[in-house]
């Protein structure tokens, strides 16, 4: 008996996503692929697998495999000894340990077994069309002549296609602005840039390296109580010792596409 997966088995939908049409939520399209059947005829085999059978890819940039359901059927009597190890692999990754998405083991005496994996990551549709996933099947301690088929595997997946996978980027934050005005967008942009870790690191590094009067600010032992160590010439301003202040130039924000949610995002 085949396992018919449900989207809810792999993905927790919010009330909004359950009620509203897909076009009005970020879950643009969630598809359940038709089955791909693998006939196992060797004690060990590595073969490509299509996890996206009949999943629409042409109109989208990315596809995410939310879950994969495997159903195995032993084609031998249930008193036979032995078992099988099934591993799902992302063949794009060269490191064997890192390329393994998940592994399942089943004994031949169980006759039928089912398991599911949750890869839960996106790939580009260009990569998806090249079938980046493989299944490694290793039958152990099952004494059967070569050329016979002791096991059949059926694979079904739940996938989501979308045109945008950057959920915490500036674009998503701008779209989330309720009041579409220039000031609001500028605030979002400023907050976003200020929160970026690389920007913080550069800003902190620059502050440590600033110098006043040829002396490093951080190494000046008088910087905390300058009034106690002010000399007669301390009020004389020297241009080379002054901190220069530059007024920020305002940059116009064009709203031709900003602030309008794309229908296929």
Curated annotation (Swiss-Prot):
Biased composition (Basic and acidic residues): 224-248
tRNA-binding found in the keyword field: no
UniProt keywords, alphabetically: Host cell junction, Host cytoplasm, Host cytoskeleton, RNA-binding, Transport, Viral movement protein
InterPro entries linked: TMV_movement, Viral_movement
Tagged with keyword Acyltransferase: no
Coiled-coil residues: none
GO function terms (MF aspect): RNA binding
A GO CC annotation given for this chain: host cytoskeleton
Membrane-crossing segments per the record: none
UniProt main location, coarse: host cell
Region of interest (Disordered), ranges: 216-248
Subcellular location(s) per record: Host cytoplasm, Host cytoskeleton; Host cell junction, Host plasmodesma
GO biological process: transport of virus in host, cell to cell
Function text: Transports viral genome to neighboring plant cells directly through plasmosdesmata, without any budding. The movement protein allows efficient cell to cell propagation, by bypassing the host cell wall barrier. Forms a ribonucleoprotein complex with viral RNA. Binds microtubules and modulates microtubule stability. Can bind double-stranded DNA.
Family: Belongs to the tobamovirus movement protein family.
The name this protein goes by in its record: Movement protein
Organism: Ribgrass mosaic virus
Gene for this chain: MP
